[in-house]
């Protein structure tokens, strides 16, 4: 059974973590320990999934954070053992000209969860308070107006029965630099590096101010922000999964006893048997 968690914000109590500081940094988690804990948590996520499906719950999880903070890896860790019919990931591209003419949050609304769904936003409507504001894609007035409206918008979501969780993954300046350098040097990661990443990297303080203003304006009792320090990606993933399982008030669904039925396998070789496949793939391994 999930432990119910109050919706008290972690922004004030973990303010030093939001700035990439820890009193006593812990050693990075070893792979063996990480895989053991993740396997256990995957079982709990599947149990939560079955409750969501059976109860018709609607869950929306928002992930925000600086570039390289680990949003994508965290989302992958959450979703790799659950059904894509229940868990859906939404990562919207830059708005089209038509979308730019609409109410700002309008393009996100069609992706909100229906009954029995968990929707995960890999960046969200908070782009307006972060990257759009810092990089000049919106005016200060537009950003401030968004921050004024966001609490009411999210209150409407919660009042409609959506369980809304908002996570900010905070990476330190040194760790962000290390991760960006690895993207430059590693041919497997070079696709992750964009011109926007480099421009954003140079504006650390501007992003910090935008983050703090976002927290101040949109950290509410009904939709609080939760901060996860993510210099150690493995610990961050486990901490986030553990937390969301504690906040979502799911109840395990009793399992039915299942056994494989008897199966009649006939010899299908011969002139009336099944035709062989047209070709096999090579087997170099």
Task: List where the protein language model places each region.
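Glycine-rich phosphate-binding loop of ATP-dependent small-molecule kinases
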Residues: 1-285
């Amino acid at each position: 059974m999930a432990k119910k968690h109050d919706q008290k914000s972690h922004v004030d109590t973990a303010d030093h973590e939001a700035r990439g500081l820890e009193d006593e940094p812990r050693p990075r988690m070893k792979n063996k320990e990480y895989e053991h804990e993740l396997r256990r948590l995957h079982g709990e996520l599947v149990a939560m999934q079955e409750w969501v499906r059976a109860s018709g719950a609607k869950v929306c999880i928002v992930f925000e954070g600086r570039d390289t903070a680990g949003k994508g890896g965290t989302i992958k860790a959450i979703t790799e053992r659950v059904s894509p019919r229940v868990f859906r990931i939404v990562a919207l591209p830059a708005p089209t000209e038509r979308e730019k003419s609409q109410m700002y949050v309008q393009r996100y609304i069609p992706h909100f969860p229906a009954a029995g769904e968990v929707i995960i936003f890999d960046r969200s409507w908070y782009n307006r308070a972060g990257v759009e504001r810092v990089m000049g894609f919106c005016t200060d007035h537009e950003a401030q107006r968004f921050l004024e409206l966001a609490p009411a918008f999210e209150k409407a979501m919660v009042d409609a029965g959506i369980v809304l969780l908002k996570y900010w993954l905070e990476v330190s300046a040194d760790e962000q630099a290390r991760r960006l350098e690895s993207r430059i040097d590693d041919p497997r990661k070079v696709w992750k590096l964009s011109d926007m990443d480099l421009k954003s990297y140079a504006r650390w303080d501007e992003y910090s101010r935008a983050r703090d203003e976002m927290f101040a304006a949109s950290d509410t009792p009904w939709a609080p922000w939760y901060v996860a320090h993510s210099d150690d990606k493995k610990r961050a993933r486990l901490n986030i999964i553990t937390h969301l399982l504690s906040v979502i008030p799911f109840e395990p669904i009793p399992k039915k006893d299942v056994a494989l039925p008897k199966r009649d396998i006939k010899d299908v070789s011969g002139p009336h048997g099944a035709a062989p496949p047209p070709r096999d793939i090579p087997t170099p391994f």
